[in-house]
Amino acid sequence: MRQFNLSGKHAVVTGGCSGIGNSIARTFIENKAYVHILDLDENQGQSVIESLGSDKASFHFCDVRDQAKVHNVFQSIAKDHPVDILVNNAGIANIGKVENTTEDDLDHVYAVNIKGVYNCLHACISIMKSNGGGVILNMASIAASAGLPDRFAYSMSKGAVVSMTLSVAQDYLGDNIRCNSISPARIHTPFVDGFISKNYPGKEKEMFEELSKTQPIGRMGKPEEVASLALFLCSDEAAFITGVDYPIDGGFTTLNT
């Protein structure tokens, strides 16, 4: 029997057009799942679906900050398909200490990274319950447990994601719903390149090397490596695992001294 076989499963991946979310979507498809990608970029979304295959994936425009629209998207999916897997991957970053994090900064991070996850959970749980169960995977960060400099709002938001993971795992044990989270360190994606360019203009190469070295293993992670862990946690091989946050961090949280 093939391990990590998601044949017949329908997975929802938020933020699935690029980076980690896109790698997760591709990995799930390679392992026979059908993937519903939720994202904000319609043009990119259609391009992604063309590359994945319209018989293997579909794109749904969705702003995870808007609860009513999130519910509408999930209900439209659930009319024809079960939601077996939810990957809450959509998120944004923010640089700043508490004193230079504005109220608008905090509200924006909250709206996407916390309320966005809540909205998708809120829309999905009842669907999974009616279908006899499911698997939820939330994308957290090492920022939830390590004191990263200049990441006040972001760290707060990812700490909330880990807390939501534990609450959902506990509350829905009796409904056959598993819930875990992944906490990556720095993963090399186009988002990271853009983030460095925006915040460290003229110092891109220097900052990339500096950020890479913060992982004791000596490099940033690859989206495909996160996707492989996501595949395991969402597969039947992980049926005995719930309420756990998994660091994938090149030794960041345990080997940095």
Predicted regions and their residues:
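Alpha-helical segment proximal to the catalytic Tyr-Lys
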Residues: 126, 170-174, 239
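Active-site helix of classical SDR
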Residues: 121, 157, 165
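Active-site loop-to-helix junction immediately N-terminal to the catalytic Tyr of the SDR YXXXK motif
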Residues: 101, 147-155, 167, 195
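Residue(s) in the substrate-gating loop at a strand-loop-helix junction
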Residues: 141
